[in-house]
């Protein structure tokens, strides 16, 4: 895929995974889907994701370099258009009219598939919006099954994750969310499963080059 490189970055902060690492693939119920969830703030992430007493694993590359990640927030407008066009070409997503429904504060909202659902979710404002819905191929990538549907809230991110995985040398995705643990928000990283090797005794996760 032809694209600029402003969205490619080396993540030079320490990263941690909070979880048991009992199997592979790991559960796909998180916002990172099939990717291994990591964060520079493990204890905050433990609270946000309600992970209880799960152990903490440190993450490092085999060559000692920082992980190389894609940051979607740094994609230019023209790159986003190209990525969306590619995702549609690959039959990963399709456009749809969705509905924003206020949830909590005035600037917080949820995305609903129908106007009726949106009105049930909110007694305040409801607005139509252009959005994206997953197609079976994207559901299979994200969940391992076409029967589960990705939320419209995450469909574009899931499609971009699929595309980012095709870029040579990339270890995963960086979601540069605001650090606000009180509102269940913190920066997070998803590592592609193929990059992962575990060292159980040292509680380390090694990313293969």
Q: What do the predicted segments below correspond to?
A:
Residues 2-37, 42, 46-209:
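Active-site and NAD+-binding cores of ADP-ribose-processing enzymes
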């Amino acid at each position: 895929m032809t694209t600029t490189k402003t969205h490619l970055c080396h993540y030079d902060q320490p990263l941690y995974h909070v979880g048991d690492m009992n199997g592979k693939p790991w559960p796909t119920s998180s916002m990172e889907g099939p990717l291994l969830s990591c964060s520079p703030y493990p204890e905050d992430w433990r609270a946000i994701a309600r992970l209880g007493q799960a152990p903490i694993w440190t993450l490092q590359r085999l060559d000692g370099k920082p992980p190389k990640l894609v940051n979607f927030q740094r994609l230019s407008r023209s790159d986003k258009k190209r990525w969306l066009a590619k995702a549609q070409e690959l039959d990963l997503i399709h456009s749809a009219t969705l509905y924003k429904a206020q949830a909590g504060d005035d600037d917080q909202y949820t995305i609903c598939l129908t106007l009726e659902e949106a009105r049930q979710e909110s007694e305040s404002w409801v607005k139509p919006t252009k959005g994206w819905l997953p197609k079976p191929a994207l559901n299979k990538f994200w969940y391992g099954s076409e029967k589960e549907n990705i939320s419209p809230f995450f469909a574009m991110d899931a499609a971009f994750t699929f595309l980012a995985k095709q870029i040579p040398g990339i270890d995963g995705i960086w979601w540069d969310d605001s650090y606000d643990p009180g509102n269940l928000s913190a920066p997070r990283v998803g590592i592609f499963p193929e990059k992962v090797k575990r060292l159980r005794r040292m509680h380390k996760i090694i990313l293969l080059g």
